[in-house]
């Protein structure tokens, strides 16, 4: 009851803030500033409410279809880092789960955690027989009980939001579905048996890639609440300065990252949902460096027809085919069937023309002679026209964003940021080239990652 009272007190405070903001009917820069202030308060509230709400906030940071950009940006800053819990509790969980104490299982076990997150913390250890260094991920105590209370309250909040909150422009929000999806993701993430299986599947997909390293799992020392994996240290991928000092090629690392992610999404249909810098590193003990993936708690599968839709979308963008792009969006479940296709294709045509103009800008002597302000004004005019067309279609609410696609789009955005940090010129679209056209009638495009790389 005490927990529920705390949750509803926080909900009431946030709802009152939203009510006051809407009552002011602010526009332009004032509205953006007010949204940022409200979003910062929301972020602090989620941190106060603890693990469940921190994870919910991280999941909501992918929902560009239902939340303002200012809120998305603030929620994206949510981190897993929280104070660690005492080592004695971790040791007790290990004994309960594995049936033996750490002194029986390991030659050494570091009491001070290597890292602590909202759902678990990680300790370094050494195996007795082989002497191999491992990391032991131990789940926080009573997490499932906390989830049950929190998610029950969140479902009620979602029910109220569906009835009181107006729908977003051009897309329909279903807070109940968002709450249910978030709950499923959370329960799956705290099942370490699921994470172990995901890590093994991911490693199998990349077994021929020498430039990609996935830490191996020790199933005999793992359970639903304990996960033991190979210890593979590395340089954080966002630490460009240290990577340069150690002689690594940022272009090579960026290529490894983009190619590996295209492999996941376009070829295997099994992808890492959270490739942020904390889950990626460069193995500085490997000649030339190799990319290390960590944390396989949030993974998604993609059905073959949806995967093909995504591949077709990429090709239709490069080949400037708006009708095919809309077909691909329908196959992906992003564009609703039966909407005003003429209006949507007109928007797609404008977007693709803008993309093609960007591709051609490097060879466009006239555009290269434009001042920075003229280029900025040209881009602003293109965006304004697209925005007007989108506004005209909002009554149909043609777009929807299935949860797995929000993960894909967020992941590509994260990878784009990492890549630009390593090599600002890597994603310059003026240098991009279209992938080779597949043979006529070919339904699959298995060489896509190579073509886009």
Predicted regions and their residues:
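ATP-dependent phospho-/nucleotidyl transfer catalytic cores
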Residues: 69, 76-83, 95, 144, ...
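Conserved beta3 strand of the Hanks-type protein kinase catalytic N-lobe
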Residues: 125-126, 275
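Short, amphipathic alpha-helical segments that act as regulatory/interfacial helices
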Residues: 50-54, 155-158, 200-203, 391, ...
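Helix-rich C-lobe and terminal helical cap/extension of kinase-like folds
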Residues: 30-32, 36, 63, 178-180, ...
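A short beta-turn/loop motif at secondary-structure boundaries
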Residues: 111-117, 218-222, 406
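N-terminal accessory/targeting segments that precede structured cores
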Residues: 1-121, 130, 145-177, 183, ...
């Amino acid at each position: 009851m005490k927990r529920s009272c705390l949750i509803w007190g926080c909900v009431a405070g946030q709802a009152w803030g939203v009510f006051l903001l809407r009552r002011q009917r602010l526009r332009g820069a004032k509205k953006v500033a007010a949204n940022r202030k409200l979003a910062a308060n929301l972020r602090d509230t989620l941190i106060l409410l603890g693990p469940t709400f921190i994870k919910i906030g991280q999941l909501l940071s992918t929902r560009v279809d239902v939340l303002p950009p200012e809120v998305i940006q603030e929620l994206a800053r949510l981190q897993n880092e929280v104070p660690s819990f005492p080592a004695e509790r971790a040791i007790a969980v290990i004994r309960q789960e594995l049936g033996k104490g750490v002194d029986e299982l390991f030659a050494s076990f570091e009491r001070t955690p290597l890292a602590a997150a909202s759902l678990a913390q990680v300790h370094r250890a050494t195996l007795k027989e082989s002497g191999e260094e491992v990391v032991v991920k131990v789940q926080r105590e009573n997490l499932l009980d906390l989830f049950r209370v929190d998610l029950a309250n969140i479902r009620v909040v979602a029910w109220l939001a569906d009835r009181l909150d107006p729908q977003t422009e051009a897309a329909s929000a279903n807070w109940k579905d968002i709450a249910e999806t978030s709950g499923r993701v959370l329960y799956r993430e705290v099942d370490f048996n699921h994470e172990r299986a995901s890590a093994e599947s991911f490693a199998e997909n990349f077994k021929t890639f020498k430039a990609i390293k996935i830490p191996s799992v020790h199933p005999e020392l793992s359970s639903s609440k304990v996960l033991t994996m190979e210890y593979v240290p590395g340089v954080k991928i966002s630490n460009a300065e240290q990577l340069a000092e150690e002689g690594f090629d940022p272009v090579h690392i960026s290529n490894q990252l983009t190619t590996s992610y295209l492999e996941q999404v376009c070829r295997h249909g099994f992808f890492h949902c959270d490739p942020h810098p904390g889950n990626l590193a460069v193995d500085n003990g490997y000649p030339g460096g190799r990319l290390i993936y960590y944390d396989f708690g949030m993974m998604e599968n993609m059905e073959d027809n949806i995967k093909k839709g995504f591949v077709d979308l990429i090709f239709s963008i490069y080949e400037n085919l708006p009708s095919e792009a809309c077909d691909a969006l329908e196959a992906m479940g992003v564009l609703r069937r039966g909407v005003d296709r003429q209006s949507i294709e007109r928007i797609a045509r404008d977007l693709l023309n803008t993309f093609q103009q960007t591709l051609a800008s490097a060879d466009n002597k006239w555009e290269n002679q434009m001042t920075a302000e003229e280029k900025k004004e040209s881009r602003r005019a293109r965006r304004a026209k697209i925005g007007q067309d989108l506004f005209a279609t909002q009554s149909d609410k043609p777009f929807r964003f299935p949860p797995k696609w929000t993960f894909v789009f967020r992941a590509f955005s994260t990878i784009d940021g990492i890549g630009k940090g390593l090599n600002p010129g890597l994603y310059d679209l003026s240098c991009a080239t279209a992938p080779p056209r597949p043979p006529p009638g070919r339904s699959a495009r298995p060489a896509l990652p190579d073509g886009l790389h």
